[in-house]
């Protein structure tokens, strides 16, 4: 995240002097403990413990294992209130997280449960026009509602298939400046892979970590 964006976030709602929760900081937290004032506090939550995250990303070149932050709360089932032991916060922040949420409405409801009255939820969301999702349709409220009413706990068949069949090897910098190279349009997977993955979701409930919710500013 650019310094300008981090500075904007830190000034928002007096983050430096408030008690907050950051979801999914990994090795690049938006709010750093050392930047807070004496009355400010930040807690970190993820779906795995610090040690489990270090093991998961040990072979991932883009993630520096020794920089993964110390996780305060682990939430494996989506119940944020239970995971945080009933704590409430002045603000909750998450970057590039809700596009992965199998059940977006439930997640937002869970965030509401852990916010103090008048609290703030800050979400940093990718614009599909500048990501590998550029060819995918924007999510409708109908699809979001379906995931909520069906109590989805893993990415839907349609999300898994669409990712395989449409996601491209996009360079965000190129897309931002309107530059399109041949390699930027190459599919990350294929329709055949999408078909196989969709069947695995249907038969086994397999969890594929893909973008479920696709956004544009409008």
Describe the residue ranges of each PLM region:
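General secondary-structure edge motif
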Residues: 3, 91, 203-204
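S-adenosyl-L-methionine-dependent methyltransferase catalytic module, highlighting the catalytic core
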Residues: 62-75, 106, 112-116, 120-218
């Amino acid at each position: 995240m650019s310094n300008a964006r981090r500075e904007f976030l830190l000034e928002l709602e007096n983050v430096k002097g408030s008690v907050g929760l950051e979801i999914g900081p990994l090795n690049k937290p938006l709010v750093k403990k050392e930047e807070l004032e004496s009355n400010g506090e930040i807690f970190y939550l993820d779906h795995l413990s610090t040690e489990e995250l270090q093991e998961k990303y040990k072979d991932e070149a883009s993630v520096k294992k020794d920089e993964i932050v110390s996780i305060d709360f682990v939430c494996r089932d989506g119940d944020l209130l239970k995971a945080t032991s009933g704590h409430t916060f002045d603000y909750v922040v998450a970057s590039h997280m809700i596009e992965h949420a199998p059940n977006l409405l439930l997640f937002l409801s869970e965030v509401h449960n852990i916010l103090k009255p008048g609290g703030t939820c800050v979400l940093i969301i990718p614009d599909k026009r500048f990501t590998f999702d550029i060819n995918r349709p924007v999510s409708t409220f109908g699809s979001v509602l379906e995931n909520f009413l069906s109590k989805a706990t893993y990415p839907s068949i349609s999300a898994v298939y669409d990712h395989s069949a449409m996601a491209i090897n996009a360079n965000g910098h190129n897309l931002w400046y309107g530059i399109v190279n041949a390699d930027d349009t190459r599919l990350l997977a294929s329709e055949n892979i999408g078909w196989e993955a969709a069947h695995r979701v249907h038969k086994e409930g397999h969890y594929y970590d893909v973008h479920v919710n696709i956004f544009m500013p409008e």
